[in-house]
């Protein structure tokens, strides 16, 4: 039995050695292939973010997510311009409760409604 154990132990060691050499060989061909590709395409490994165009767009930042954001920003710009054009700074709202006498008279419409007329057809 001692001979069998001795025979098994060297076999296990050689199996472990084979795995180690396979790992080393697995790394070496990858490194060799990587070096070959770097030699073939030298400009690819230098920029770790993409093309110049992509980097410029990313640095610029995104202004609007979609057309809704664009339209809301456009409306805000118009609202900022209106008060500066000519607003009454003395106008205070909320202090006075309007009454029917304070409200201006309603303009009569030029087209008469069929419902408002007293004619029944």
Curated annotation (Swiss-Prot):
Q: Which GO terms describe its cellular component?
A: cytoplasm
N-acetylserine sites (modified residues): 2
Return the protein name. Alpha-endosulfine
The annotated subunit structure for this chain is: Interacts (when phosphorylated at Ser-67) with PPP2R2D. Interacts with ABCC8. Interacts with SNCA; interaction is disrupted when phosphorylated at Ser-109.
Query: Spans of biased composition, class Basic and acidic residues?
Result: 16-37
Q: What does the protein in this record do?
A: Protein phosphatase inhibitor that specifically inhibits protein phosphatase 2A (PP2A) during mitosis. When phosphorylated at Ser-67 during mitosis, specifically interacts with PPP2R2D (PR55-delta) and inhibits its activity, leading to inactivation of PP2A, an essential condition to keep cyclin-B1-CDK1 activity high during M phase. Also acts as a stimulator of insulin secretion by interacting with sulfonylurea receptor (ABCC8), thereby preventing sulfonylurea from binding to its receptor and reducing K(ATP) channel currents.
Q: Which gene encodes it?
A: Ensa
Spans annotated as Disordered: 1-53, 79-121
Tissue specificity of this protein: Present in striatum (at protein level).
